[in-house]
Amino acid sequence: MPSFDKPTDQQEATRDAQGADSRAATEVALFEAFGGVRGMVETTVPGLVFVAIYTVKRDIHIAAIAALGLSLLLGIARLVRKDTLKHAFSGVFGVAFGAVFAMMSGDAKNFYLPGMLYTLGLAVGYIVSALAGYPLMGLILGPVFKENLSWRTRNPGRKVAYTKASWAWGLILLAKSAVLFPLYWWGDVTQLGWVKVALGIPPMLLSVYLTWIFLSKAPPPIDVFAEMEAAERAEREREATAR
């Protein structure tokens, strides 16, 4: 009869340690990819400044310039701290685009339109990529985990997790868009601005949390860079032996 030995305490401890390491690595990778809580705050605060100043002053130019100036200061602070450049510049460019669009059009609501269109496009991208078998979350996080596209063919459990995460991001961002666009069309700028600020951090936190849940339960990533380095070392050793 086959033996069904229970795992030893040492084996269970090893598995628990491996699981904890995997969860910690996933958490670090997610914070690196999405800028952490600080990145979420930085994308929300300029919009808060814009709607607050516009509510009081009713001046598009003052509100837009103030929001852009704050975004620039936040970007410079990231550069001084030697943080990732993509987080330093992405927020600045987004706010600058919205500020210019609002001032040129003369409609304060257009300050938020570029970001809303980006959110909607991102939602569609997540959903379409998941349906196509190339989940966008895998394309984003694969290089961070040093697995590149190995999850598509060699690690099906990771592909399932990335697909679930992409669906989560897509549906959450789609729901956010379903709230904001009616306000853009039929509400006033104050309503749109405050609701957009309120919907800035919670949906992203929920999306990141669900992604963490899916990936922490998935198999560990295959480090393709380590594999290539090992293959190169083996090749050098064979050449040295041949000499």
Named regions from a protein language model:
Residues 47-55, 72-76, 99-103, 124-127, ...:
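Alpha-helical transmembrane segments of multipass membrane proteins
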Residues 85-96, 112-119:
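Cytoplasmic-side transmembrane-helix entry/capping segments in multi-pass membrane proteins
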Residues 17-32, 45-56, 72-82, 161:
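Short juxtamembrane and helix-loop transition motifs at transmembrane-helix boundaries
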Residues 1-35, 232-233:
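Short, Lys/Arg-rich, polar N-terminal cytosolic tail immediately upstream
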Residues 145-243:
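C-terminal membrane-adjacent module
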Residues 80-84, 104-112, 189-190:
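Membrane-interface helix caps and helix-loop-helix hairpins in membrane proteins
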Residues 109-160:
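Membrane-proximal helix-loop-helix units in multi-pass membrane proteins
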Residues 53-69, 88:
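Structural signature of hydrophobic alpha-helical transmembrane segments
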